[in-house]
Amino acid sequence: VPAPAELPALADEEIIERISAVHGIGRWTVEMLLMFQLGRRDVLPVDDFGVCNGFRLAYGLRGMPRPKALAKYAERWAPERTLAAWYLWRAVDLHRAGKLPARRGKPPRVAQLKKKTKSAPQAQRR
């Protein structure tokens, strides 16, 4: 585990790898440390429910995005993915308050981001 004084000099992924090696500390926890304690600007916690839900709401998707596909889509937001996370969390807040504007037109090509859901057998669909 790196000493606190070492952290500013380390890359985000190196910090994630080294700290999440500690039993009980996962990637999400380290990403929150990077964002809120170290002020890193290019972190998008794609496993965060709020980030995924905000993306679903903002882009008018029916299903939740898969984390890997969301990470790929979010490459265009670098080097400001932390800011994107904040806006995605805010989209959830606005939706709950009834203030998220409805999307007009087709959503961008993000269909591949939806999680696959098991469809019911034909006999049960009636």
Task: Tell where the protein language model's regions lie, with residue ranges.
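Catalytic cores of DNA base-excision repair glycosylases
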Residues: 1-126
